[in-house]
A protein has these predicted regions:
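C-terminal outer-membrane/trafficking sorting elements
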Residues: 416-457
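Acidic, glycine-anchored loop motifs typical of Ca2+
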Residues: 110-123, 297-300
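Active-site recognition of the HExxH zinc-binding catalytic motif
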Residues: 126, 206-221, 308
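Post-HExxH zinc-binding segment in Zn-dependent metallohydrolases
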Residues: 231-268
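Low-complexity, Pro/Thr/Ser/Gly/Ala-rich linker/spacer regions in secreted
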Residues: 1-4, 405-421
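Fold-level signature of zinc-dependent metallopeptidase catalytic domains
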Residues: 1-32, 82
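Active-site-proximal beta-strand/loop segments in catalytic clefts of secreted hydrolases
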Residues: 11-16, 127-131, 218-219, 241-244, ...
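Non-catalytic C-terminal accessory/binding modules of secreted extracellular proteins
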Residues: 21-61, 65, 69, 136-198, ...
Length: 457
């Protein structure tokens, strides 16, 4: 297994009128981000440990923690809600620009933070003094989020005129001037707060891991349009509100699809009749609604696909609401993931519940926590994703899930699967020769969820 190590900047910033707590030193934030063993306030590990574990050692982020950078403006200047919209920080573009310029003044060379040589700074993360609006902070607090400077400048979240994005009536960019430091463009970024909830306790890793998930290409699984939905995964998923489990100290493991999307696991296809063993932290499975085998397009397939995994209350999953077999239903849409709206207009990423309820009612406390997984408290022993497939005799013993898989479609009794797992191709015409070059997964910046997958030539 080849380990990919990414290097990014974590800028710790203070406002003109608000400073870090004296006990929250740069060293303490470096430990939170990078320590091999991080247990402060009951933490299960550091941000680095979390992503090492999610990738089974294939990916290790390292953060150069810089600061504190003292920003020229007050917290309220950057963070006050624009036109009364909660979470829409009025001058967030200026916040990012000032944080990056301040880091440069401390000696940071941004040319060292473009590992994929695409001209953009990688892994821009800002941790700001005080509270965040998302977990009880005032409307003048910045809402922890991930975004990009093109959008922030286009929507006018700035008070200066040096940097801008202009579009025509069709919404196409006709001119822009993005911040460039040491020859590298500041484009995508993420940020979160120093203090958790309304207390004065130092932040935990949960929200940082959530926002860093956006940097890697993951989308929010709650509804980002501000409306309520009881079909979102809730505390069962880091990218919903699982980042708050154990006061943010123990975010849950990523779902099997998210690991698949990032190139860290490859689920087996459920196609052939027989008994299936599903151990925790072991094999995972997926199922397509097809009666014949076609090339597998990987996590970017636009089919409705079901994913099956065994999740037990240990390690990063210690504080999950329950345990057993989780069934995820995913309908991938590149545009919806790119714009961070997979569950807004319709539910494209959902957790199927054993008793037919909604995961939202089984969240952080109360509710019937074992209603979600199979077999669960309702002892649900059967599930039929499609008319021609069924899972029967679902059982759990000693943390291992077993079931009998039946597929009545005769054309796939003995399938052969041509796996094109998550592959993206660069196609170039060189004279009379067509050159096709495959690239790897998006954690190294080679492609994003917006990229098309080659289907046929």
């Amino acid at each position: 297994v080849t380990e990919l190590v990414s290097r990014g900047l974590l800028r710790v910033v203070e406002f003109a009128d608000l400073h870090l707590k004296e006990s929250n030193t740069i060293h303490s934030f470096d430990s939170l981000a990078n320590a091999d063993e991080y247990t402060y306030n009951g933490a299960t590990g550091s941000c680095k440990q979390y992503y090492q574990d999610q990738s089974n050692g294939k990916y290790t982020p390292h953060f150069d923690v810089i600061g504190p950078v003292v920003l020229p403006q007050t917290q309220a200047f950057y963070g006050t809600d624009a036109v009364g919209v909660s979470g829409d920080d009025q001058y967030i573009a200026d916040f990012v620009i000032d944080a990056c310029k301040g880091a440069q003044q401390l000696g940071v060379d941004f040319a060292n933070y473009d590992q994929d040589n695409d001209g953009n700074v990688d892994l821009v993360y800002i941790l700001y003094a005080g509270h965040g609006q998302a977990d009880g902070g005032a409307s003048t607090c910045i809402w922890p989020h991930a975004w990009d400077m093109q959008s922030a400048l286009y929507f006018g979240n700035t008070k200066q005129t040096e940097f801008f994005v202009k579009t025509n009536s069709m919404g196409q960019i006709i001119s822009q001037n993005l911040p460039v430091l040491d020859g590298k463009t500041i484009l995508r970024y993420a940020c979160s707060n120093e203090l958790v909830y309304r207390s004065n306790a130092r932040t935990s890793i949960g929200t940082i891991c959530h926002e860093f998930g956006h940097v890697l290409g993951l989308a929010d699984l709650y509804r980002t349009d501000g409306t309520d939905s009881k079909e979102v995964p809730g505390s069962w998923a880091l990218m919903s509100n699982g980042n708050y489990l154990n006061n943010g100290n123990t975010p849950p493991n990523l779902s099997v699809w998210e690991k698949y999307f990032l190139g860290w696991v490859e689920p087996d296809m459920l196609v052939k009749n027989g008994a299936i063993n599903l151990p925790a932290d072991g094999k995972t499975y997926k199922m397509l609604n097809r009666t014949s085998i076609v090339p597998n397009e990987g996590a970017l397939s636009t089919d409705t696909i079901y994913y099956f995994e065994n999740r037990q209350k240990s390690g990063w999953d210690t504080y999950l609401p329950g345990w057993g077999m989780l069934v995820w239903r995913v309908v991938y849409d590149a545009d919806e993931w790119y714009y961070n709206t997979p569950n807004n207009t319709t539910t494209r990423f959902m957790l199927v519940t054993a008793n037919g309820s909604t995961p939202y009612t089984n969240n952080l406390s109360g509710g019937k926590r074992q209603d979600v997984p199979f077999p669960g408290s309702w002892e649900v022993t059967e599930y039929q994703p499609y008319s021609h497939t069924s899972l029967t005799n679902i059982a759990e013993e000693d943390g291992i899930i077993t079931f009998l898989f039946t597929n009545t479609a005769s054309s796939i009794d003995n399938p052969t699967i041509d796996n094109m797992f998550n592959q993206v191709f660069d196609i170039k015409l060189d004279g009379s020769k067509l050159k096709i070059k495959g690239t790897s997964h998006n954690v190294n910046g080679n492609y994003s969820a917006k990229t098309d997958v080659l289907r046929e030539l």
